[in-house]
From Swiss-Prot:
Reactions performed catalytically: dUTP + H2O = dUMP + diphosphate + H(+)
Protein name: Deoxyuridine 5'-triphosphate nucleotidohydrolase
Reported cofactor(s): Mg(2+)
Keyword Methyltransferase on entry: no
């Protein structure tokens, strides 16, 4: 799949999104910063990537997801948990960054901060019904299938 990518900050030509390995699902996104940013515990920051994409096809969307190592080792996750990029969005990709850890974290310019995953999308329509056909689960919700 070929994506249209717009470079909004010329410095990002040297840091284009790429897969770290042949089996990677996510393309690494980097922080397009002029200087380091210090995130104290509980702080949030909206970090630019210097890039924009246009998927164009409504059968696809992109997800911005955290990098597992940053979350596990440093408590750096996404403030919005998952960033959803719609197929018709053409603006800059921004990374909502949250330090949920216990110590300060310094985010350096061009550091890998998140990952971009392209996913298929089905746009549903609704069929209004009075009742559903019976299922084994029914309306059983949280914890209804047991613990083990």
């Amino acid at each position: 799949m070929k994506l249209d990518l717009k470079i909004l900050d010329a410095r990002m030509r040297d840091y284009l999104p790429k897969y770290a390995t042949t089996g990677s699902a996510g393309l690494d996104l980097r922080a397009c910063l002029d200087a380091p940013v210090t995130l104290k515990p509980g702080d949030t920051a909206l970090v630019p990537t210097g890039l924009a994409i246009h998927l164009a096809d409504p059968g696809y969307a992109a997800l911005i997801l955290p990098r597992s190592g940053l979350g596990h080792k440093h408590g750096i996750v996404l403030g919005n948990l998952v960033g959803l990029i719609d197929s018709d969005y053409q603006g800059e990709l921004m990374i909502s960054t949250w330090n949920r850890g216990q110590t300060e974290f310094v985010l350096n310019p061009f550091e890998r901060l998140a990952q971009l995953v392209i996913v298929p999308v089905v746009q549903a329509t609704f069929n209004i019904v009075g009742d559903f056909a019976q299922s084994d689960r029914g309306a059983g919700g949280f914890g209804s299938t047991g613990r083990h």
